[in-house]
């Protein structure tokens, strides 16, 4: 059940980020380093290529979620860490905005689960 909750949460975060309108940019948000602020108060600070999140960056939501890591074409791709509001984290590989590849989920109580993830689901 927890696997499905994570998938739902990640899907909502990705959908919200993709649909929120940008309201302002500081720096070079076209081809360089900049900070975008969205109408829902989500922020992105990092590298941009052709006005897309691309390279290293940090995306933060007002509800406490924070992703730090690599982006490709505005999606989480490569190595990254997602921190949940309760302090839980996922650290590992990402592709197309989902946990894909080797990674470790650490709950706020310190319990860990390491394994191979595919489209946000732990493969057991």
Question: At which residue positions do the language-model features occur?
Answer:
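N-terminal signal peptide c-region/cleavage motif recognized by signal peptidases
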Residues: 15-17
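Sec-dependent N-terminal signal peptides
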Residues: 4-13
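Conserved anchor residues at repeat-unit boundaries in beta-strand-based tandem repeats, strongest
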Residues: 22-31, 43-54, 66-77, 89-100, ...
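Alpha-helical adaptor scaffolds
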Residues: 58-59, 63-70, 82
